[in-house]
Regions:
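PDZ peptide-recognition modules
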Residues: 1, 5-24, 37
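C-terminal "post-core" interaction segments
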Residues: 17-20, 29-238
Length: 238
């Protein structure tokens, strides 16, 4: 419960005795969207990383992009995004797609559904902005829904690796003993009607990952090199 203490025992390498730390439980809000300005003197390009799809991810993204006046291009990074809430994936896709464009459909053992763009946020300034989307083998589930929707509607150029390939709809049933039973009840289908399960989303342009040394701050030069190469390749920066 929030406000109650918890004691952690930490055994460090080279120490025979565990250290005790008392912490206070708190409700921690972690933002799922990060943005960076990659603009030149001529163009405004926004790099956006979505870590996962949680409550209000789409609104967070809309607000951050809306705070920039005149964006000339967006790089949407979904690498190592494990997924999350289906509704948020639909709304993120909706930000960049005009009304009635198919985003995803579900085919289930009991219930099936279709989800088309509805312009939830009426963000018309984002509909025609040049868009590059980055994926890799760690992009799964809801991240793949966004990638497939924007790729198959020819709204974004997808760059990177073939994605993970998790296209199942699951639900969790609570049992009387406090445990839970997770059941697969359907599958996601892309706008073209195809399943991505165990297949993934193929990028328009495949990049072969390489290992580079880490910098002191824990980041690598490769990330920024990939970003700027992407910008120049697709004309986001002149």
């Amino acid at each position: 419960n929030i406000g109650t203490p918890v004691t952690l025992s930490v055994l460090r390498k080279g120490h025979a005795k565990a250290l005790q730390f008392e912490l206070l439980r708190e409700d921690i809000q972690v933002e799922s969207v990060e943005t960076y300005d990659l603009s030149s003197s001529k163009q405004t390009v926004s790099y956006v990383r979505i870590k996962n799809f949680q409550i209000d991810t789409s609104r967070e993204l809309k607000n951050k992009l809306g705070s920039l006046n005149m964006i000339d291009g967006v790089i949407l990074d979904l690498r190592n995004n494990p997924g999350g809430l289906l509704e948020e994936a639909i709304r993120v896709s909706d930000l960049f797609l005009p009304g009635k464009k198919r985003i995803v459909s579900t085919k289930g053992t009991v219930v099936s559904s279709v989800h088309d763009a509805k312009q939830f946020f009426a963000a018309e300034h984002l509909l025609n902005i040049p868009l590059v989307l980055l994926i890799n083998r760690g992009s799964a589930s809801a991240a793949e829904i966004v990638a497939a929707a924007l790729k198959q509607n020819e709204r974004a150029i997808v760059i990177g690796e073939q994605s993970f390939g998790k296209g199942t709809v699951q639900t969790l049933w609570d049992l009387k003993d406090g445990s839970g039973l997770k059941l697969t009840i359907g599958e996601y289908l892309t706008p073209s009607g195809r399943s991505i399960h165990n297949i993934g989303v193929m990028p328009n342009l495949r990049l072969i990952p390489v290992t580079v040394p880490e910098l002191k701050n824990g980041e690598t030069e490769l990330g920024r090199q990939e970003i700027f190469t992407t910008e120049k390749r697709f004309g986001l920066l002149s």
